[in-house]
Amino acid sequence: TCIDDWRSLGLGPSTPASSAVSASSHVAEEGVTEPINLRTWTLDDLDDTQTTTFVSASITSGVQNGKLTAKVFGYDIYKKEEIEKLAVGDKIAFHEEGAAQDQCVTTEVKSIERNDQHHFVSINGGMEQPGGLDLKLEDDDTYRTMTFDDYPLYYEMGEKTMPLAEDVVLKDSSADPQAEAVETTGADAVAAAINADPDNWTTYNTTLVVQGGKVLEVRRIWVP
């Protein structure tokens, strides 16, 4: 169950929520608008051999013995039609900044502002307010959370150690905003590149492409 209200966290989103349950055992609460990916994706899905998954990640300890350890992050996504019919008095579930995957909170919608020109929705005064949330139309049929500089509002899904594929490719365009991606191929060369700059692979600039539990690509972009 999502925590009934943001206030019940007491000490804020960094406090573990004792009443939270794992995503796999979660049951949707009637009358609450929930993220569509709340119950449908876990770290175990990265081991799926039939699916290629793109994840935002923070590489925490470089590459050791051909394996990298990364904190994997997600963000809340909602069906467009559910956000468009959301009204004052309804409830919405989301992850606050710094939350873990199982620390979903539910809050009552007390105010809602819509910017149709830019496809923004601000709930309860936006993310800077307690129980507030900002949403952006991501594509034709989903909204996602939004924070400063247009980033999603990330929550941590957990840490996972994964081997680099033998033919792994690093695409690194982090040098400057206009930089062309510099490609490095092969597990040893990619490991050396990551380990040469160990502290600069973060949620905001790093994407891992994973299939069957192996890292096929590492992508890093420039961020301010």
Question: Positions of the model-derived regions?
Answer:
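N-terminal Sec-dependent export signals
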Residues: 1-33
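Solvent-exposed hydroxyl-ligand-binding patches built from regularly spaced Ser/Thr
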Residues: 23-224
